Amino acid sequence: MRIRSSVGLVILAPAVVLACGSDPTDAGSLDGGAGGSSGSGSGGVSTGSSGGTSSEGGSRPPASGSSSGVAGSSSGSGSGSGSSSDAGSSSGAAGRDGGPAAASADAGLVQTVGVDGGSGTCGGGAAQTSDITIDVSNLQQTIRGFGCSSAWAGNLNDATNDPDTLWSTTKGAGLTMLRIRYGDGLGVAKAAAQYGVTVWMTPWGTGSSGAPGGPDTTTQINPNGCKGSMPVLTNGQDLANNLVSWVQNAKSQGVPIYAVSAENEPDSCGINQTTSYSPGQLAAWIGSYLGPAMSNIGVKVMAPETQNACGFPGYFSAIQSNAAAWGDVSIFASHEYGCGTLPSEPSIASSGKEYWETEVDTGAVNGDSDGMPSALHLAQTIHDDLTKANLNAWHYWWLWAGGTSGLYDTTTKVWRKALWVMGNFSRFARPGYVRVSTSGNPPSGVAVSAYVNPSSHAMVIVAINSNSSSTGLSFFVSGSPPCTLVPWETSANKNLAMGSSVTVSSSRASVTLPAQSVTTFVGMP
C-alpha cells in the first residue's frame, strides 16, 4: 500500500508570541469562566485485539476497536467532535521529582484563546490545502489526567521499588491518577501522593464482606439476580458513614481522596462484583445517601462505572432523571470492555461535570503483551476516547500483574511498552491542559491529537504511527508558532526518548515518525 511521504500540519497559535525555553509540562494555574467549542480529532487506526483477564471475574470481552494486529499498511481515520464547558481553577504543589503535580482542585475550561493573524519570530509561511490543521483557539475538554488501578495489587513490590517509573515527569511516564479499592491498604497510594497524583476510590461489592463495615451478604441474592446486598434498600446510611470514615482515615495518613465512585460495574455479576444495581437503584443510592455524605466532607461523587459503552446510557439517563443524584454526581465514568468507544455526551460538559474512562485491559496483540503492537492498540484507544468522546481522564486497569493485565509484567519483570505510550500523553498533556481541535487528512495509519497549556501556551502534539515503516510529516505552523518542536519517542527500542529539537522555519518543520511508534512533540513557549 502506498504511504504518503508527508503531510502538513497547521497550528493556529495564540495571540501571545511564543518564546523558546520555558518548561512545556508546567500546567500552571487555571482560573477562567466557562468556555465551549466543538472540533475534531484527526486520524486513527485501531490495531490489535484485546481481551485479557481481570480480577473482577473471568475473561473480558475485547476492548473497543479490536482487529487482527499491527499491519504494515494499517489504514483508517477517526474524528471526534463535541462541546465542552466547565469552570474552575487548577492548582497543585510540585511533585516529588520536582515536576508539575496533578491538580488538586478543579481544572476548568478557560476562555477561548485569541488567534494572532500576524506572524511571530518563527512564522511567516503560508498554509496548504492538504495540511492537517491544529486550531488552538478551538478549545475542547480540559485534561484531568491518566492513570491506573492498584486494586488487589498489594503494597510496594519489585515493580514499585522505583516509583519514579510510574509517576515522575522527568524519569518515568508521569502518570497523574491512581484508582484504589475501598478496603485495600494505602501503601501504593501514599507513594503516589508524594508525586502529587490524584487518588480516588472505588468500592467493589459495597455492603458485602469484602467492604469493611458491611454485613456478610455474599450468600444473599439481590433483586437483580446477583449475590450481594442492596445498600440503598437495606443499610444505605451505614454504608455511607463507613465510606466517609474510610476517606477521612486515608486523609489522616497523607492520602487525600479526590472522588468516590458509587460502585464498580453495577451492571455486572463478576466473582468480585458482589453488589449489582439497576439504573434506578444506583441513582437512589447516590441521591439518598452517598451524595449527601460526600458533600459534607468535600469529596466528589463518581458514577456509574458500568462495564462498557452499551451499559452506560441507561445508568446515565437514570441519574439525569433523579434530581438529587444529578446534582450530586460530578464525574460520569465507564469502563470499556467491548461495545466500542464510549458515547459522546455533550450534556456532561455543558453541566460543568467531567467524563472519565476508568478501566480497560486492552490485552495482547498476536500473543504479544509487552511490546509495541499491544502498546499501539492502547495508544489508539486513548486517542479515540479523547477525540471522539471528549473524555477528561483515562485509566488502564492494573499497575502491575502477571500476564497481560498490568503495565508491569510480574512474570517477565519488565515494564510493558503500554506504560510508555501512556506516558506520551500523561507526561506532557498535564492536568489543566486543554485538547484543541485538529482537522485534515493524516497519512494512513497515523493519528494526531493536540493539547495546549492555556496559561503558558505550550503546545503538545501526540502522533501515533501504526505503520511498519517510517512515515513523514510536514508540520505547518501559522500565526505565532513555537520556535522549536522537541520530539519524545516511544518505539521498539526507545521509552520516551528525547530527540533532537526540530527548528520551525518560515512556519514549517519536517519530521519523520519511526515505524510503530508514538511520538510527542512539545512546542516550547
Language-model features: locations:
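Sec-dependent bacterial lipoprotein signal peptides
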Residues: 1-18
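Ser/Thr-rich, Pro/Gly/Ala-heavy low-complexity intrinsically disordered linkers and tails
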Residues: 15-126
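Substrate-binding cleft and catalytic face of glycoside hydrolase catalytic domains
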Residues: 137, 170-320
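Aromatic/acidic polysaccharide-binding cleft in carbohydrate-active enzymes
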Residues: 352-429, 436-442
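C-terminal beta-strand-rich structural cap/linker in extracellular carbohydrate-active enzymes
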Residues: 502-525
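Noncatalytic carbohydrate-binding groove/subsite architecture in carbohydrate-active enzymes
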Residues: 276-381, 388
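Carbohydrate-binding surface patches
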Residues: 441-483, 516
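N-terminal module-boundary/linker segments of secreted carbohydrate-active enzymes
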Residues: 114-168
